[in-house]
């Protein structure tokens, strides 16, 4: 069947750099959450390409991280605060948010706040534990090279409890059996990024290492951080981004060079039971596999300085520091686009290759990215025929959303 012609649209609402984008599950079709350098947040209807909800932080602090979980918009900002936001009127949004007509933006209210160290630009990991209780992985309050783990109840303002404090994983790295003692590494550097998948939390460090961690709680004892995976694939360059490739079942990482680290899940999805803990060396609350070795596997892309990674149906989407967005299949570029100072979207694709040496230098800087694959829609009820047709057209395409320093978001389709 012949593929669709690529489509591109511009989402305009932000007046400053778009620093964070996140696709959010919604009915009948996912929506996009966006945040900027001055603390403004929006939820976008991707069929009408209009915002239907918004919020402005009083501190005007830059948005670093966005997640939608259990009807909470979870937001980390540079004022050292993680906030749980909730729509004032979820029913109104559900009924009216999908209509094509203009209406006043729905607003959010703050339901919970947690202080978080944001001296660097690392994100956090937030997971749901039970009922209204959540777990937070983040940089240590005073030291961005170490991590803390908290639990809290969003319905109890004074429920914050620290499970793990100031864990530094430098010793775990140098204990890897095949780490060359001739290599120079006196510290990990700061934590650059976090990612959680299937109970394992992945950390990307300034020194180029990627670690897979689990938190084990045993009755009557303090929690233990289990180091189940270590890779030095990017050493000594910093890890810039982490993402999950569902089709290949791997975690991918990027850095300042052209290498994409490939971290296979089977190598580190360890279920640590009471009996298995004997195979670990435990010191200062950190458990390390006695046979821990570095696992370094990578592929290479025709660009470098990859600040943002995403995966859709096996395709790898990469955004580099110069402003280019590449859609790749393994190491081959299938589609490439950028936004120039002339405000024109430029298709740089050329027979599946990308010549970095001839790239123009007038791109607008890309500052955030999110992506979504083709969607299977449930039966569409209660919406007009025209809206139904437009929703189906959106669902039959894969999309990349790239945020730029001029406040715009490009919504670009591509084939998968």
From Swiss-Prot:
| Repeat (WD) residue spans along the chain | 13-54, 58-95, 111-147, 234-273
Keywords carried by this UniProt record: Chromatin regulator, Nucleus, Repeat, WD repeat
Offer one example of a GO biological process linked to this entry.
Answer: chromatin organization
Q: Which SUPFAM superfamilies match?
A: WD40 repeat-like
The answer to whether keyword Cell inner membrane applies is: no
* UniProt record similarity statement: Belongs to the WD repeat ASA1 family.
- Record note on quaternary structure: Component of the ASTRA chromatin remodeling machinery complex.
Annotated function: Component of the ASTRA complex involved in chromatin remodeling.
Q: Which protein is depicted?
A: ASTRA-associated protein 1
Question: What gene is this protein translated from?
Answer: ASA1
């Amino acid at each position: 069947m012949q593929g669709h012609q690529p489509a591109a649209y511009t989402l305009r609402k932000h007046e400053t750099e778009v620093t964070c984008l996140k696709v959010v599950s919604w009915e009948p079709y996912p929506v996009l959450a966006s945040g900027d350098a001055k603390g403004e947040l929006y939820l976008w209807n991707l069929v009408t390409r209009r915002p239907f909800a918004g919020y402005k932080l009083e501190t005007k602090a830059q948005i670093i991280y966005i997640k939608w979980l259990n009807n909470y918009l979870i937001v980390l900002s540079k004022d050292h605060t993680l906030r749980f936001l909730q729509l004032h009127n979820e029913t109104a949004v559900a009924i009216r948010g999908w209509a094509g007509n203009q209406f006043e933006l729905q607003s959010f209210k703050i339901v919970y706040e947690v202080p978080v160290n944001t001296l660097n630009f690392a994100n956090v990991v937030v997971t749901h534990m039970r009922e209204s209780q959540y777990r937070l992985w983040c940089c240590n309050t005073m030291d961005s090279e170490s991590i803390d783990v908290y639990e809290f109840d969003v319905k109890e303002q004074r429920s914050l409890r620290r499970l793990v404090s100031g864990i530094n994983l430098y010793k775990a790295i140098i204990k890897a059996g095949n780490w060359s003692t001739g290599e120079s590494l006196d510290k990990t550097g700061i934590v650059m990024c976090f990612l959680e998948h299937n109970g394992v939390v992945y950390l990307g460090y300034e020194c180029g290492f990627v670690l897979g961690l689990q938190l084990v709680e045993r009755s009557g004892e303090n929690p233990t951080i289990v180091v189940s995976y270590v890779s030095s694939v990017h050493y000594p360059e910093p890890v810039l981004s982490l993402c999950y490739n569902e089709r290949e079942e791997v975690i991918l990482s990027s850095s300042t060079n052209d290498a994409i680290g490939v971290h296979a899940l089977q190598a580190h999805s360890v279920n640590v039971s009471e009996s298995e803990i004997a195979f670990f060396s435990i010191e200062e609350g950190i458990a390390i596999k006695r046979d821990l070795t570095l696992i370094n596997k990578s592929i290479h892309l025709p660009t470098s300085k990859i600040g943002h990674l995403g995966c859709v149906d096996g395709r790898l989407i990469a955004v580099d520091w110069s402003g280019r967005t590449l859609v790749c299949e393994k190491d081959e570029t299938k589609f490439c686009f950028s936004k120039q100072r002339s405000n024109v979207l430029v298709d740089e694709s050329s027979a599946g290759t990308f010549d970095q040496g001839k790239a123009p230098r007038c791109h607008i800087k890309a500052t955030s990215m999110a992506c979504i694959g083709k969607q299977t829609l449930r039966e569409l009820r209660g919406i007009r025929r025209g809206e139904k047709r437009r929703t189906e057209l959106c669902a039959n395409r894969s999309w990349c959303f790239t945020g730029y320093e001029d406040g715009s978001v490009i919504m670009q389709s591509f084939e998968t």
